[in-house]
Design a protein with these regions (language model features):
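Alpha/beta-hydrolase fold catalytic core
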Residues: 1-23, 44-47, 77-80, 84-86
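Short, charge-rich amphipathic segments
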Residues: 10-11, 34, 65-68
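Conserved HGGG/HGGXW glycine-rich cap/lid loop of the alpha/beta-hydrolase fold
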Residues: 14-60
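Active-site loop/oxyanion-hole signature of alpha/beta-hydrolase fold enzymes
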Residues: 49-88
Length: 88
């Protein structure tokens, strides 16, 4: 399991296994990636990725007004930086 931050400050936890396509767990507003801990434990034998959305948990917030597009761009940047080609 790898934890880290992207260049723009997104905190993530990546459990890379032989199964090449990770399951991505995205929490809601007001929560953190830790809300998914039971599911992450259940899927520990599979590749999975969880992260804190902008301004939540250990992820930074780079601007005051955040849109849904910003959350989408955050995920795209994360999977690009981790060189993930496909996700569930």
């Amino acid at each position: 399991m790898t934890t880290g931050n992207t260049a723009s400050g997104t905190f993530y936890v990546f459990n890379k296994k032989e199964q090449p396509v990770p399951i991505v767990f995205i929490h809601g507003v007001g929560l953190t990636y830790e809300i998914w801990q039971p599911q992450l434990n259940f899927f520990k034998n599979y590749s999975n990725l969880s992260y804190d959305i902008l301004g939540h948990g250990k992820s930074s917030l780079t601007k005051q007004n955040v849109s849904f597009d910003d959350f989408s761009e955050q995920l795209i940047e994360l999977i690009d930086e981790l060189k993930i080609e496909k996700i569930h």
